[in-house]
């Protein structure tokens, strides 16, 4: 059984011990059905995906021995003989840019995207422009790292979403002034 769940860095795997939490409920139901349950937080980049995508993976077995944790095949650092993370450049290598259709950013969004270098987001805009660029979102909590975000050629992509031109999930091309 493999269950994916949208998560954030604040996700706490102790929820499996917290009555009322979804993870607690799932774990208890699986254990009641006779399964030995193992779960952990995994980053897809550590398994060869050219994007940073953290997910909880639950594995179950009827065996009395728990399923071992998954072993990464890639790393952000050169350790344990693992391959380096795959990058956005790796993912798009060989694609013909002339054949890539895309939508355009609005003029307002484009104004700020043009100011960003590869790998930057709204926090890299001049301080005096940040409130104007972010509007009401400027005063909200959370990291807001998806706003005015330009990809970096030599890093994995953030989680790829269906619509890369929406304000909170923007993915701008590393060097072209357009969404993916």
Predicted regions and their residues:
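Bulky hydrophobic/aromatic "packing anchor" residues in well-ordered structure
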Residues: 42, 92, 160-161
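Soluble or luminal CAZymes and related metallo-dependent hydrolases
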Residues: 18-22, 84, 180
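Flexible, glycine-/basic-rich loop-and-beta segments that form/coincide
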Residues: 49-104
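C-terminal target-recognition/interaction regions appended to catalytic cores
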Residues: 106-180
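Short, solvent-exposed loop/turn segments at secondary-structure junctions
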Residues: 44-48, 63-65, 164-168
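Conserved Class I SAM-dependent methyltransferase catalytic core
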Residues: 1-61
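Active-site rim elements
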Residues: 12-17, 78-82, 101, 108-113, ...
């Amino acid at each position: 059984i493999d269950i994916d769940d949208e998560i954030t860095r604040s996700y706490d795997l102790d929820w499996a011990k917290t009555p009322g939490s979804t993870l607690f409920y799932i774990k208890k139901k699986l254990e009641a059905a006779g399964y030995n349950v193992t779960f952990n937080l995994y980053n897809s980049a550590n398994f060869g995906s050219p994007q940073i995508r953290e997910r909880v993976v639950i594995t179950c077995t009827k065996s009395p021995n728990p399923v071992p944790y998954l072993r990464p095949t890639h790393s952000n650092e050169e350790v344990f003989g693992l391959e380096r993370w795959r990058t956005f450049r790796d993912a798009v290598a060989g694609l013909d840019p002339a054949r890539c259709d895309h939508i355009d950013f609005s003029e307002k969004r484009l104004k700020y995207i043009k100011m960003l270098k590869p790998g930057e987001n709204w926090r890299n805009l001049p301080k005096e422009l940040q409130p104007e660029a972010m509007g009401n979102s400027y005063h909200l909590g959370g990291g807001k790292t998806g706003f005015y975000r330009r990809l970096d050629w030599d890093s994995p992509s953030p989680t790829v979403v269906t619509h890369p031109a929406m304000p909170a999930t923007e993915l701008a091309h590393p060097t072209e002034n357009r969404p993916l």
